[in-house]
């Protein structure tokens, strides 16, 4: 069974793009990520994150990175649609990776609503949406 983990980085347009990244692998291989030392990137130094990146890419079956330019972020903020923009790009990653189940880090105050939106935008893919998913699921941390 293929599972996918998706997280964002850089929600502030002032500092650059918003990046949505996902990885997919067989569920039985999750221990490989744990043994590499993969965990929430906020708990790792930049050097360790950089070293882990190469190892993660070699370990997972597939990955996809989407970058949202600052002007798109600014336009969404003005319309109060930043969460919607993020859901659209997460759905794009979900569709590209096409796993059986995708775990996402919810930016919405209502994770279930966020997961349903991503599922609808990705043609019914199974989504598990949680707050702090990057701390709870190693596949999201990757």
Predicted regions span which residues?
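Acidic (Asp/Glu) carboxylate-rich active-site/surface patches
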Residues: 1-4, 8-17, 23-142
